[in-house]
UniProtKB/Swiss-Prot annotation:
Name of the protein: Probable nicotinate-nucleotide adenylyltransferase
PANTHER family: NICOTINATE-NUCLEOTIDE ADENYLYLTRANSFERASE-RELATED, PHOSPHOPANTETHEINE ADENYLYLTRANSFERASE
Domain of life: Bacteria
A Gene Ontology BP annotation from the UniProt entry: NAD biosynthetic process
Disulfide bonds: none
Catalytic activity: nicotinate beta-D-ribonucleotide + ATP + H(+) = deamido-NAD(+) + diphosphate
Pathway of action: Cofactor biosynthesis; NAD(+) biosynthesis; deamido-NAD(+) from nicotinate D-ribonucleotide: step 1/1
Organism listed in the record: Sulfurovum sp. (strain NBC37-1)
GO molecular function: ATP binding; nicotinate-nucleotide adenylyltransferase activity
UniProt EC number: 2.7.7.18
Similarity annotation: Belongs to the NadD family.
Amino acid sequence: MVNQSKPEVAIFGGSFDPPHKGHQQIVRKAVQILDIDKLIVLPAYLNPFKNVSLANPEKRLEWCYQLFDGIPKVVVDDYEIRQNKSVRTSQSVKHFNNTYSVKYLIIGSDNLSTLTKWHEFKWLNDHITWVIVTRKGHPVQTEGLKSWRILEIDFPISSTTIREKKDLRYIDNKIKQSVEKTIKDKKE
């Protein structure tokens, strides 16, 4: 009998507002070290923990398509954006479990302080392995997590810093002009 198991995937969700070279590093390293068939980059329609946005969901999705295009095993999915509302992580994991076996959820260490407040945290904690990306100033505290892996990334900037300081050094040339225009238009 042929094994009909589902492809194993990791989900890397986020605002990607804007996506930058650090996100590319995370994706490339995750594909290298995780035993997965596919990595799904999942831009959020609206992050329930954030209220300031540089770009609309469609623009952020477009940037993600451009930025992650050509990286083996990586797909950008518009599931959350198509919902036209904030989508909880557990809902997305359940959605993708219909087609795949969601094995990993990639998060920044800055999320750890609020992780237990996530909707259905216990369910998530029982069903996935957390892949924690190191972020400066945010210690990796794994108390309460059932299964986790650390993804060491030494990247000096965040999307928040890029938005606040208008610092485009860490924006890939594929999307730099568009991000610059969006920042300029937002100021006016």
